[in-house]
C-alpha cells in the first residue's frame, strides 16, 4: 500500500536501538559478506519499486551475482569504494583482479569517524588525503631501491616507489609475503585480514617490483647489491611486559599459539595488555579447541581500543562462549601454579590459581 508513496526501498539490518543491532550498521569482518542478499530477494519478489541492499558487499562479483539473481536493483558498497574508488571503472574494463577488496576491519573508516578523526583506510592510506597523495609525480632521478621485509609496510613502500619509476627489489626472509598479516588471519573470524596481503602483492606486481623470497637482508647482501637506498621494514617481535616469574608455569605469547609452537594445558589465563582483538581472539581459539580459558584485560573492558562495532560483535561472541573476563588487570608475576595480577585502579592484588 505504501509503494505508491516510495521511490525505493533500502534493506539494511543495522539499528541504534541496541549494541548488538548497531554492529550491523557497519558490519565487521566476522559477519559473512553479502549476508542480507537472500532477505533482500524475499522483499524484491513482492515489490514493484527499486530495491537497494547493503551489508558487507565488498566485491564486484558479489554485487553482480545479487543483481543477476534479481535479489536487488542496487548494491550499496560504501567501504568497498573507500578502499578502492576505482572499483567500478576497473570492473567495467575487465580488471576485476586489480580491485583492492575491502576486508571490513573497520579500523580507519568508521573507526576513525567514531574517534573524531578523518576517514581513511588501512589498505589505502591516501584516502582522505587525495590532494597530497592521490597522484604521486614520477621521479626525475630513478634510484635502485632495496626493501627489507615483505610485510604490509614493505610491500606498500615497494609498490609506491616502483610506481613512481624507481627500480625496486623487495627481499623477504621467509617463503611467504604478508608479515604479521599471516598471523592475524589465523584468529577466529579474521581470515579476510589475509586479503590485505593479497591486495598488496597485486599492487607490487602491477608496479613492477621484483620480489625475492627466502632471503634475509644482511650487510653482505647490501654490499653486493649496492642499492642507492635501503628501506627497512623488518617488522616487530611480540611484546612481553616486565613481570616477576618463578617456577615452571608455562608462559607463551600469541605468536607461539598461532604458529602452533606451544601446546597449552587444560586451564589457560590469557593476559591482554592491548585491549584489541588479539587477546580475545586467542581466548576464543583456545576455548574452541577445548581449553578452559579466562581472559584478563589491562583496560576498562575487553576490546577497549577496537572500533565500536568490532568490539561489540566480539563481546557478544565471548559471552556466548562463556569466557570469564576480568578488567583492570595488570600482570604482576607468576610461580608454579599461580598468576598474580594487580587491579589497575585500586592497586589491590588479584590471584588466579592454576
Q: Which role fits each region the language model picked out?
A:
Residues 1-148, 152, 156-163, 167-168, ...:
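Flavin-dependent oxidoreductase catalytic cores
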Residues 9, 147-214, 272-313, 324:
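Beta1-alpha1 glycine-rich phosphate/pyrophosphate-binding loop at the start
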Residues 11, 77, 230-233, 270-271:
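Redox-cofactor binding/interface segments in oxidoreductases and associated redox assembly factors
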Residues 15, 235-238, 274:
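Short glycine-rich anion-binding loops that position phosphate/pyrophosphate groups of nucleotides
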Residues 19, 85, 112, 131, ...:
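Glycine/Thr-rich phosphate-binding loops of Rossmann-like dinucleotide-binding domains
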Residues 26-32, 134-145, 183-195, 254-260, ...:
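Short, contiguous acidic/charged loop-to-helix segments that flank catalytic cores in large enzymes
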Residues 194-239, 248-249, 255-259, 263-264, ...:
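A Rossmann-like FAD-binding core segment of flavoenzymes
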